[in-house]
């Protein structure tokens, strides 16, 4: 199978084939997931919670993100690697640019930034430098304290209108992909149709161009014993982790996941 590139993802959006994305933090899982057909591996700052045991993603450093990106690169067999810029990277445009370069040098093919239209400047600068960017809208975990917790975003019309505007503004700034987290399914569908770039959803319904889950969540692993509403345990009925990951890929591709029960109403 040829390596997945940004052009591949754009082609999948145009053809209507769904994009399967999973978080990944090490070489062994990168090898397993890429061999199972996962299109995109997300080296997420969620590692702060599922690997390090923090209650948010805020303590994660960009150097830790680079370390895990390098680990994933060594095991990857053709998936596109997207890496989160850490919370500490957002205090200035100069810092964002420098940290993005560090992640690309570590093996990322694209970096992910959380936030709204205010990200237009760093996204435009990164695009000029040849660094593809995935913009992350909706529930952005790095802003959990501003939101007052992990809550669905975009239910109020003013919020929904702002998210639509932000998506279009960030695409115009040069974002190559968009991730929508915990927004009403109807709103996610509207945004997916409004932009030309691939849109990946998590807790955003089935109408986005693809889906992403935290690897540990979809394998039924949790520090708290509770899973978010948008998660399905793909280990159920499977004999191995590779089989569970392959089942996830199939479910995303045939649109049997997510079901209505995994999404949110407006």
Swiss-Prot record:
CDD domains cross-referenced by the UniProt entry: KPHMT-like (cd06557)
Ligand binding (3-methyl-2-oxobutanoate): 45-46, 84, 112
Top EC class for this record: transferase
Cofactor: Mg(2+)
Keywords linked to the UniProt accession: Cytoplasm, Magnesium, Metal-binding, Pantothenate biosynthesis, Transferase
Subunit structure: Homodecamer; pentamer of dimers.
Protein name (database record): 3-methyl-2-oxobutanoate hydroxymethyltransferase 2
Originating species: Pseudomonas aeruginosa (strain UCBPP-PA14)
Phylogenetic placement of the source organism: Bacteria, Pseudomonadati, Pseudomonadota, Gammaproteobacteria, Pseudomonadales
């Amino acid at each position: 199978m040829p390596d997945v590139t940004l052009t591949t993802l754009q082609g999948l959006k145009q053809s209507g084939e769904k994009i399967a994305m999973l978080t990944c933090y090490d070489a062994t899982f990168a090898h397993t997931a890429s061999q199972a057909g996962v299109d995109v591996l997300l080296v997420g700052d969620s590692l702060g919670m599922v690997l390090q045991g923090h209650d948010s993603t805020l303590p994660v450093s960009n150097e830790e993100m680079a370390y895990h990106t390098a680990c994933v690169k060594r095991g990857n067999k053709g998936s596109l690697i997207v890496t989160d810029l850490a919370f500490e990277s957002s205090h200035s445009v100069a810092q964002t640019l420098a940290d993005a370069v560090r992640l690309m040098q570590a093996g990322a093919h694209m970096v992910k930034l959380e936030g709204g239209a205010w990200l237009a400047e760093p996204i435009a600068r990164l695009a000029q430098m040849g660094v593809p960017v995935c913009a992350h809208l909706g529930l952005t975990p790095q802003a959990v304290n501003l939101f007052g917790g992990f809550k669905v975003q975009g239910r109020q019309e003013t919020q929904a209108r702002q998210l639509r505007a932000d998506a279009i503004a960030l695409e115009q700034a040069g974002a190559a992909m968009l991730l929508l987290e915990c927004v009403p399914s109807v709103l996610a569908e509207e945004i997916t149709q409004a932009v030309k770039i691939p849109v990946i959803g998590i807790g955003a319904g089935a109408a986005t161009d693809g889906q992403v889950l935290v690897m540990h969540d979809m394998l039924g692993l949790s520090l708290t014993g509770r899973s978010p509403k948008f998660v399905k345990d793909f280990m159920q009925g499977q004999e191995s982790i590779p089989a569970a990951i392959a089942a996830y890929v199939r479910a995303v591709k045939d649109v049997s996941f997510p079901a209505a029960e995994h999404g949110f109403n407006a």
